[in-house]
């Protein structure tokens, strides 16, 4: 299996276990976790499996008010990525950004909390499926 050095923008390659999604209607802060990721290379080779296979954070904190994605304090990683484009429309939350030569896009179903993430960098594409739940405690 080829590893891609997927950064926080690859973000949601989070937990290897199934997560439970929740209603995010009106929420500004939530926690996301992923259950499955697929990474494909320009040569046509693809790898697929649990998100933890790529050694990425187990959880990602999403802060819409401050437009940022962060690892949790418990991860010990202290990584933050800015959200450059944020839209809430037709029951969806769309987050997009670009950092370290990687572009990312999240599509979150606001009612169910289910999330699909796409990450792209030169010759590599990653897709991640997961779930988000409201975050009620302070950062």
Tell me what each language-model feature is.
Residues 123-139:
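C-terminal partner/receptor-binding element of secreted or periplasmic proteins
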Residues 64-102:
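Contiguous, well-ordered beta-strand patches that form the walls/edges
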Residues 106-107, 116-127:
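Short, exposed beta-strand-loop hairpins at the edges of beta-sheets
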Residues 58-60, 103-108, 130-134:
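Hydrophobic/aromatic beta-strand elements that line small-molecule binding cavities or substrate pockets
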Residues 26-27, 31-66:
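Short, solvent-exposed loop/hinge segments that bridge or flank secondary-structure elements
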Residues 37, 66-72, 115-117:
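Short polybasic amphipathic segments
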Residues 5-15:
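Bacterial N-terminal signal peptides
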Residues 17-21:
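Sec/Tat signal peptide C-region and signal peptidase I cleavage site
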């Amino acid at each position: 299996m080829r590893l891609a050095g997927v950064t926080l923008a690859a973000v949601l390659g989070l937990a290897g276990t199934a997560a439970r999604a929740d209603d995010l209607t009106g929420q500004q802060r939530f926690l996301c976790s992923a259950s499955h990721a697929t990474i494909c290379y320009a040569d046509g080779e693809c790898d697929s499996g649990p998100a933890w296979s790529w050694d990425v954070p187990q959880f990602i904190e999403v802060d819409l008010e401050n437009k940022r994605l962060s690892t949790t304090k418990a991860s010990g990683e202290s990584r933050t990525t800015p959200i450059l484009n944020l839209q809430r429309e037709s029951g969806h939350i769309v987050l997009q950004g670009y950092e370290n030569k990687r572009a990312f896009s999240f599509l979150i179903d606001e009612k169910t909390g289910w999330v699909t993430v796409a990450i792209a960098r030169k010759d590599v594409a990653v897709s991640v499926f997961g779930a988000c739940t409201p975050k009620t405690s302070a950062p």
